[in-house]
């Protein structure tokens, strides 16, 4: 996975609450088993007409909005468990999703796929939406090392929480296997000195 330290980017605002995984990636697209190619189907039913043409009123079809940060309403990623939702978001180019609440399973799937879910207060989320409404090119700065998100050019910022293990993985670009391999020497040293493991030899 790509290393993640600090991202400064314009945003794609999606001020809709309770966005579930079927809205993120409809079930009819779940037949594929590889991660690539799902980005074009992200928010498909909102993004395209039945004939496949883009809906002009959907934010991802508006040339004013682009970037690596998706900002969504409260309770993002609810509904059925499907890792494809994280795959679609990542394949569409997003590295960060900001909301005031995430479904637990979506949060885990996002982190496992190199996407940082940043949970902020309702008030700070509103500040972001207000700033982007006033200026479509407004940038956010997401500082993972210090666990701070800020609205660029203003004094508005807020800290966020992340599991320390997942933080380490994101900063180093590790998935779970990469992390285990990175501490292989420590594991082997422990195996040699552990009296409990020696009993199994």
UniProtKB/Swiss-Prot annotation:
Gene Ontology cellular component terms for the protein in this record: 3-isopropylmalate dehydratase complex
Pathway membership: Amino-acid biosynthesis; L-leucine biosynthesis; L-leucine from 3-methyl-2-oxobutanoate: step 2/4
SUPFAM superfamilies (UniProt xref): LeuD/IlvD-like (SSF52016)
Molecular-function GO terms, alphabetical: 3-isopropylmalate dehydratase activity
UniProt keyword list: Amino-acid biosynthesis, Branched-chain amino acid biosynthesis, Leucine biosynthesis, Lyase
Reaction(s) this enzyme catalyzes, per UniProt: (2R,3S)-3-isopropylmalate = (2S)-2-isopropylmalate
Family, similarity comment: Belongs to the LeuD family. LeuD type 1 subfamily.
Name of the molecule in the record: 3-isopropylmalate dehydratase small subunit
The organism of origin for this protein: Cytophaga hutchinsonii (strain ATCC 33406 / DSM 1761 / CIP 103989 / NBRC 15051 / NCIMB 9469 / D465)
